Amino acid sequence: MNNLERLRSENPLVICYTNDVVKNFTANGLLSLGASPAMSEAPEEAEDFTRMASALLINIGTLTRENEEDIIKIGKIANQQGTPIVFDPVAVGASTYRKNFCQRFLGEVNVTVIKGNASEILTLIDFNTTMKGTDSDSELDSVNIAKKAANTLNTAIVITGKDDIIAKNEKIIKLSNGSPLLTKITGAGCLLGGVLASFLFRNTQPSIDLLVEAVSVYNIAAEFAEQAPHVNGPSTFLSELLDQLYQMNDITYKNQVKKVEI
């Protein structure tokens, strides 16, 4: 059984502590893929949920003073339960508040994968970095940032951009699938965090090949969505992306994946 078949067979529970803007899209995307999202945010039920969950996604897009302690509590409970965590430090370089929170979170919680654009990942290892928001700086050296971040933070790193870079231990892989229309819909990167979590299967030390598959399945679905005859802009692309995630299979993944080890 390949990983995509396993995902659909097991229908893994993925707890999504994600931002308010993208909850609906993230949930629908994971359902289309074959996972079972739970948008649970209460620390009081975190022990029960993380015990059953395949993974926990934490996305700080709408971080507030009111929820920051809950995020850390839930992360610590997931650690106690042995549940892998995907961490998405959205716009961490945009404010000192976000930088300080991420520094604290990563100091108190062990994460399995950190996903972000080059600017966000750079900020995690160089807190003097500034950025205007969630946008990535295309001139940054994503390969070296990923390598340094993986070593410094001792976790798997996924950097998104025109090409995606995955770094784990001393191995680095560049992926070249995707669609420019992903940048025209809100929550595309946030959904990718959920897709990564769906592929973890309670594994806190996933292989880099598993991470490659998760990212590539999503990006290949985006390519196919862009190419659909009726897609003529962001709105039709968004709905078609859900359909392509639903239709994705292992043969298509293996035939279409564009990857190279660096």
Curated annotation (Swiss-Prot):
Cross-referenced InterPro entries? Hyethyz_kinase, Ribokinase-like
Q: Does the keyword ATP-binding apply?
A: yes
User: What keywords are assigned to this protein?
Assistant: ATP-binding, Kinase, Magnesium, Metal-binding, Nucleotide-binding, Thiamine biosynthesis, Transferase
Pathway-wise, it operates in: Cofactor biosynthesis; thiamine diphosphate biosynthesis; 4-methyl-5-(2-phosphoethyl)-thiazole from 5-(2-hydroxyethyl)-4-methylthiazole: step 1/1
EC category = transferase
- Residues holding substrate: 39, 187
Does the keyword Iron feature in the UniProt annotation?
Answer: no
Q: Which reaction does it catalyse?
A: 5-(2-hydroxyethyl)-4-methylthiazole + ATP = 4-methyl-5-(2-phosphooxyethyl)-thiazole + ADP + H(+)
* EC number of this enzyme: 2.7.1.50
Q: Which cofactor does it need?
A: Mg(2+)
Q: Which GO terms describe its molecular function?
A: ATP binding; hydroxyethylthiazole kinase activity; magnesium ion binding
HAMAP family referenced in this protein's UniProt entry, alphabetically:
Thz_kinase
Function of the protein? Catalyzes the phosphorylation of the hydroxyl group of 4-methyl-5-beta-hydroxyethylthiazole (THZ).
Q: Which family does it belong to?
A: Belongs to the Thz kinase family.
The molecule here is called Hydroxyethylthiazole kinase
Q: Which species?
A: Staphylococcus epidermidis (strain ATCC 12228 / FDA PCI 1200)
Q: Which gene encodes it?
A: thiM
